[in-house]
């Protein structure tokens, strides 16, 4: 895509501080960087743990970090896709939409549906969302909350 400014993925470009929580309990911190690759054809996400003394031991033991993802945009239907991989050897293909208000990621897989619904706030410098799982795609259970805060605009 020659005009990156028209691509919704442009909203993610930069560095973000991440915090994960589950049932009100702090799990851990990470840092994610979203960058254009292949002359603006795709966005790559690289996320790494940020070690801290308050990381939940269970989270640290099963952390997906580092995470790598490639995001792309279908300009004919206005939808995006994410190819995801992590340190646990997990590989997923997610469908995705990114609007001015929300970032939604989902995967329909028999017995293990997943979705993330995040909303933009603070002039799009914060994304507050939740990962959920479902066995049947109907009844959803919270997995963990995830907040992205733009780090490259912090003062």
Descriptions of predicted regions:
Residues 1-155:
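Hydrophobic small-molecule pocket/channel-lining residues, especially in calycin-type beta-barrels
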């Amino acid at each position: 895509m020659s005009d990156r400014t028209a691509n919704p993925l442009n909203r993610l470009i930069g560095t973000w501080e991440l915090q994960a929580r589950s049932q009100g309990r702090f799990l851990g911190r990470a840092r994610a960087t979203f960058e254009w690759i292949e002359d603006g054809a795709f966005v790559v996400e690289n996320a790494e743990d940020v070690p801290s003394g308050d990381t939940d031991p269970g989270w640290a033991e099963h952390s997906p970090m580092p995470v790598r993802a490639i995001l792309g945009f279908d300009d004919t239907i206005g939808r995006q896709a994410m190819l995801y991989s992590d340190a646990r050897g997990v590989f997923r293909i997610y469908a995705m939409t990114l609007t001015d208000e929300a970032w939604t990621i989902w995967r329909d897989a028999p017995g293990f549906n997943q979705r993330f619904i995040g909303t933009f706030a603070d002039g799009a410098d914060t994304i507050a969302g939740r990962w959920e799982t479902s066995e049947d795609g109907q009844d959803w259970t919270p997995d963990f909350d995830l907040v992205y805060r733009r780090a490259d605009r912090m003062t």
